[in-house]
Amino acid sequence: MRNEIRSLRTAHGLSQQQLAEAMDVSRQTINSIEKERYTPSLPLAIALARYFGTTVEDAFHVDNSS
């Protein structure tokens, strides 16, 4: 699943650690989401989208190419 979390985070001037603390997850979790190695749970995806003032659909993109 592709996502816009890195671009949203950097546009808001946040480090991975700052975002992790705001979401109550580890920095490694944020890093894994940004590198698309980990798909967040629905509650975390919603929390991330709300934090950045966007929708889950705009923050995360399902890749249907396979």
Label every PLM stretch briefly.
Residues V25-Y38:
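Recognition helix of helix-turn-helix/homeodomain-like DNA-binding domains
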Residues K35, T54, N64:
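Short, conserved catalytic or interaction motifs in soluble domains
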Residues R50, D58-S66:
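Short, charged recognition helix plus adjacent turn
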